[in-house]
Amino acid sequence: MSSAIERKSLDPSEEPVDEVLQIPPSLLTCGGCQQNIGDRYFLKAIDQYWHEDCLSCDLCGCRLGEVGRRLYYKLGRKLCRRDYLRLFGQDGLCASCDKRIRAYEMTMRVKDKVYHLECFKCAACQKHFCVGDRYLLINSDIVCEQDIYEWTKINGII
């Protein structure tokens, strides 16, 4: 289960934060170290308040309060995206090399086919594709626009 991490402030003049709290700092207890939170900025996640340094992945220890990070909470564990996918994600096979793709790896997807980034290249000239490049998917082979005619001719498709 993915959960948002909210950034909080006790100073109403500070922007941007998700919310300015009107709670005396002495009443806020960190969900990690159980100490009072006297910091100007702190986090709220899993219905608790946290020092920014105390909200971390239970497996790898990375800070979950950094901008752009998501918190995954399952079976009582706070997890980063990578560790969540490593534990609970589903692995698959690359349509090009037939080797395992780990759930946390970056991939390219074309229709129902999934590829390692390094395998997402033209089957004829081996050129890696860039954003905007045109290609054709023939079975599980990806062929660049320049090689389509030759590839289909060699492989008896036309």
Curated annotation (Swiss-Prot):
Keyword terms: LIM domain, Metal-binding, Nucleus, Repeat, Zinc
Stored InterPro entries: LMO_RBTN_TF (IPR050945), Znf_LIM (IPR001781)
Tissue expression per record: Expressed in early mouse development in central nervous system, lung, kidney, liver and spleen but only very low levels occur in thymus.
Compartment(s): Nucleus
Annotated CDD domains: LIM1_LMO2, LIM2_LMO2
UniProt record, GO biological process: embryonic hemopoiesis; negative regulation of erythrocyte differentiation; positive regulation of transcription by RNA polymerase II
Domain LIM zinc-binding: from-to ranges: 30-89, 94-153
SUPFAM superfamilies on file: Glucocorticoid receptor-like (DNA-binding domain)
GO CC annotations on file: nucleus; protein-containing complex
Molecular function (Gene Ontology), one example: metal ion binding
Function summary: Acts with TAL1/SCL to regulate red blood cell development. Also acts with LDB1 to maintain erythroid precursors in an immature state.
Free-text domain note: The second LIM zinc-binding domain interacts with KDM5A.
SUBUNIT field: Interacts with BEX2 and KDM5A. Interacts via its LIM domains with ELF2 and LDB1. Also interacts with basic helix-loop-helix protein TAL1/SCL and can assemble in a complex with LMO2 and TAL1/SCL.
Protein name: Rhombotin-2
Protein source organism: Mus musculus
Lineage of source species: Eukaryota, Metazoa, Chordata, Craniata, Vertebrata
